């Protein structure tokens, strides 16, 4: 977008984090055509740099015309188009107490009827509409703000730098090249030799492989950003609560020798190897006539469905028996699962059936023997062993549009296979390109844009 989009109103909001109510500095951001004039009305300054673009100067916030000052501030002016939003932007750097920053904001809003509180994400939305950033960069800004670990923050910054757009544009350019040739053949059929379907299918296969790789990595991206939810499942008294306490490094669940001690779900959020994990301790599964315990067991099966990963724990003392097999059969086949044999300190591992050892981690939770192997197994099965090779974060919206594009390309294969009219290839390729354009924000409705930016914080 070359032109700068402006609106009649000017927006303002607290742009810094002040959730605890205290801080050294708080920033009020103002954007719009009245940003500078509105701030001039409430700021007294003698600085020779006052109101110059990209200059910081000192001033005082004036509450009324009687020169009553309420705060000493630093003011940063960024004039259109050289600002984040593309509009005139002023930042007021106040002292960080919640009382004073709210007071300054209130004075600012009362200075001009065309200044209002910004909607969530409205600064970023204006930056997008003015062509300062694409939609993936805007979403990456929000991801960076909400990052829960360093790797998630790194992926978010990669998106801010435009890495997502680069990958999408690369795929889109491949499809545009194919589309240009096909449309030229449709319009000037007599000027071309026969169409090389084999070459076309080969080129499209390469494009599909790029898309499939992005979609495949998207789940791993989600684990890095949102975390892995891990349900501890098994019969009573096999060590589920002990494992929760071991991973949490503190006692979160009551541990006794009495079967059925855990009757409700206990959840603990941890960060292990810089990956957020939610460990869910569930009630032991067994036949029972006790009503409260039965409710807990029902919740256990509910958590199996909700979780990304299942650790099924059984006692090596008792062995892996028919009851264990029956419970595992209830776990959906698509679920990632690791079987953990606990209490290895109480038995001679040489006497364990070799079939039982297959795909099983042997552990002594009591003696903390096997924790590293368990963590490594979780990370490997979730595809995070080579986490450094994942350099972008694709959210659910991106994945949906990539899948739609992949569906379009699969349809072109069917068109060729069934010898359907040649111009249908053009239609599917155009739809595929359009689905890719939606990712970067070139093909979106105003309603959908509003929905995306509404999930941002107000000051961004």
From Swiss-Prot:
Enzyme class, top EC level, equals hydrolase
Q: Mention any one GO cellular component term assigned to this protein in its UniProt record.
A: cytosol
Mainly localized where? cytoplasm
Which positions are annotated as binding Mg(2+)? 241, 262
**Binding of K(+), residues:** 237, 256, 258, 261
PROSITE patterns, A to Z: G_TRME
Where does the record say this protein resides? Cytoplasm
Is Chloroplast given among the entry's keywords? no
Task: Domain (TrmE-type G): give its ranges.
Answer: 227-383
The record's Gene Ontology biological-process terms are:
tRNA methylation; tRNA wobble uridine modification
Which annotated residues bind GTP?
237-242, 256-262, 281-284
Q: What is its EC number?
A: 3.6.-.-
One Pfam family from the record:
MnmE_helical
Q: How is the cofactor bound?
A: Binds 1 potassium ion per subunit.
For this protein, the record's InterPro entries field holds: G_TrmE (IPR031168), GTP-bd (IPR006073), GTP-bd_TrmE_N (IPR018948), GTPase_MnmE (IPR004520), MnmE_dom2 (IPR027368), MnmE_helical (IPR025867), P-loop_NTPase (IPR027417), Small_GTP-bd (IPR005225)
What GO MF terms are annotated? GTP binding; GTPase activity; metal ion binding
Query: Which Gene3D superfamilies does the record associate with it?
Result: P-loop containing nucleotide triphosphate hydrolases, Probable tRNA modification gtpase trme, domain 1, tRNA modification GTPase MnmE domain 2
| Keywords from the UniProt entry | Cytoplasm, GTP-binding, Hydrolase, Magnesium, Metal-binding, Nucleotide-binding, Potassium, tRNA processing
What cofactor does this protein call for? K(+)
Annotated binding of (6S)-5-formyl-5,6,7,8-tetrahydrofolate, by residue: 29, 91, 132, 460
Q: What does this protein do?
A: Exhibits a very high intrinsic GTPase hydrolysis rate. Involved in the addition of a carboxymethylaminomethyl (cmnm) group at the wobble position (U34) of certain tRNAs, forming tRNA-cmnm(5)s(2)U34.
Its quaternary organisation is: Homodimer. Heterotetramer of two MnmE and two MnmG subunits.
- HAMAP family from the xrefs? GTPase_MnmE (MF_00379)
Family recorded in the similarity comment: Belongs to the TRAFAC class TrmE-Era-EngA-EngB-Septin-like GTPase superfamily. TrmE GTPase family.
Name of the protein: tRNA modification GTPase MnmE
UniProt organism field: Prochlorococcus marinus (strain MIT 9301)
């Amino acid at each position: 977008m070359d032109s700068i989009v402006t609106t009649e109103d000017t927006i303002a909001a607290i742009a810094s984090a002040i959730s605890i109510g205290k801080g050294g500095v708080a920033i009020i951001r103002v954007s719009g055509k009245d940003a500078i004039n509105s701030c001039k009305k409430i700021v007294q300054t003698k600085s020779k740099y006052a109101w110059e673009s990209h200059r910081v100067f000192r001033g005082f916030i004036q509450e009324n015309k009687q020169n009553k000052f309420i705060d000493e501030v630093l003011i940063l002016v960024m004039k259109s188009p050289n600002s984040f939003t593309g509009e005139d932007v002023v930042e007021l750097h106040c002292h960080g107490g919640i009382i004073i920053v709210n007071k300054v904001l209130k004075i600012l809003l009362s200075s001009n009827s065309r200044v209002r509180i910004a909607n969530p994400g409205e600064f970023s939305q204006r930056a997008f509409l003015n062509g300062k950033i694409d939609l993936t960069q805007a979403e990456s800004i929000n991801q960076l703000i909400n990052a829960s670990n360093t790797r998630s923050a790194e992926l978010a910054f990669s998106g801010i730098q435009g890495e997502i757009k680069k990958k999408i544009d690369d795929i889109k350019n491949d499809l545009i090249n194919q589309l240009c040739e096909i449309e030229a053949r449709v319009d000037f059929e007599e000027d071309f030799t026969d169409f090389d379907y084999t070459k076309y299918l080969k080129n499209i296969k390469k494009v599909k492989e790029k898309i499939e790789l992005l979609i495949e990595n998207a789940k791993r991206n989600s684990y890095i950003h949102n975390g892995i939810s891990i349900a501890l499942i098994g019969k009573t008294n096999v060590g589920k609560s002990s494992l929760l306490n071991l991973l949490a490094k503190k006692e979160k669940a009551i541990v006794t020798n009495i079967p059925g001690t855990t009757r409700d779900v206990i959840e603990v959020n941890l960060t292990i190897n810089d990956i957020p994990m939610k460990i869910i301790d569930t009630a032991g599964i067994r036949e029972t006539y006790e009503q409260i315990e039965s409710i807990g067991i029902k919740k256990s099966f509910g958590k199996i469905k909700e979780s990304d990963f299942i650790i099924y724990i059984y006692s090596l003392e008792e062995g892996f028996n028919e009851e264990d097999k029956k419970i595992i059969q209830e776990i959906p086949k698509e679920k990632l699962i690791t079987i953990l044999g606990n209490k290895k300190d109480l038995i001679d591992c040489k006497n364990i059936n070799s079939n039982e050892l297959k795909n099983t981690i042997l552990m002594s939770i009591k003696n903390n023997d096997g924790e590293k192997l368990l963590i490594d197994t979780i990370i490997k099965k979730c595809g995070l062993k080579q986490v450094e090779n994942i350099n972008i974060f694709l959210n659910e919206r991106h994945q949906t549009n990539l899948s739609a594009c992949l569906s379009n390309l699969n349809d072109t294969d069917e068109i060729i296979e069934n010898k359907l009219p040649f111009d249908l290839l053009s239609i599917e390729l155009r739809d595929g390109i359009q689905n890719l354009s939606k990712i970067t924000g070139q093909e979106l409705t105003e309603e959908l844009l509003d929905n995306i930016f509404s999930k941002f914080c107000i000051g961004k």
